[in-house]
Amino acid sequence: QHNRAVYLKDGWIRDPYIYLCEDGFYYLTGTTPTYGDTREAGDPYNLGLDHVSRKMGLKPSIVGYQIRVWRSPDLAEWEYLGEPFSLEKGYWAQQFPDAFQNKSKKNWLLWAPEMYRVDGKWVFVHTSPEPVGNGANLIIADHADKNDSFAFPMGDDMRDKHDPSLFRDDDGTWYLTWSNTEIAPLKPDFQGLAAKPVHIDPSDRSIGHEGATIRKIGKKYVLFGTAWSTDDSRKGSYNLYYCTADRITGPYSERRFAGRFLGHGTPFQDKKGQWWCTAFFNGNIAPVSKLGIQNRDLSETAQTINEQGTTIVPLEVKTGKDGDVYIRAIDPAYAVPGPDEAQRFQP
């Protein structure tokens, strides 16, 4: 039912991304371990962030170097498809083979992949800090499970594109967003940037520090972004915020609250048109209880109610008489900012 969070599936994942394809399947990908890595069984709450783990004396990150994909006809039963892409097959491996040869695979990292079906092909984007720094890829391939050949039409234009995300406007123009938040239209067939990037943000403050993406709801462009509730890295809850605009390049409204514990989630619609957002475990300690969470200050360290795995949270999305869009998590555990929230929102 569209009133409470739903735990979809287990398995270590960050930044879960769900895409409803024209073939009737929901596709799931995200930041994951490499296929066959058994470490997650003994370390289910691995942080996935080496620089944080080292400071805390925890085990190294189990993040891998592949895009991995699952699909489902109903969001309930999930089939594992495979690994349609791996970093050693990417554009930067072609440009800097020594970087790949000189760094152990355990230090190769593929973060936050997204996938789209375009003109009979699959288009993937992701970010990667290692073995080539800021080495994001835009990949065109034939299949969502296994591929032998790839196209990289953006080439060098994908360098320094942290957390890339794609958006297709009503006129068919594709836009790339990245790095909270730069945006630029793309040339036909993703052949590069069609114009210089424009910086977009809410009118009152930054949207956040990562995980930016755009949706169009009614006549409004909605920019989503992720930040810690306290405005202090890995302190408090990892939240989702948004702002709206009449033009894709802005100006945008003030930053608004979409949901607690929904940071770097994917807003998507199901087959009934209902809105949901993905959610995942992102904390320095094991998940905390939902009991009384609305009134609990979490500012001591990074904390979440999300179990390891993929959760989806129902969203209320409505358009006012003025055409503006209101978005808020429906489940009470996600619906209100906590006492640790740095921003004060209008009622």
Q: Which functions belong to the PLM regions below?
A:
Residues Q1-P347:
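Carbohydrate-active catalytic/glycan-binding domains of CAZyme proteins
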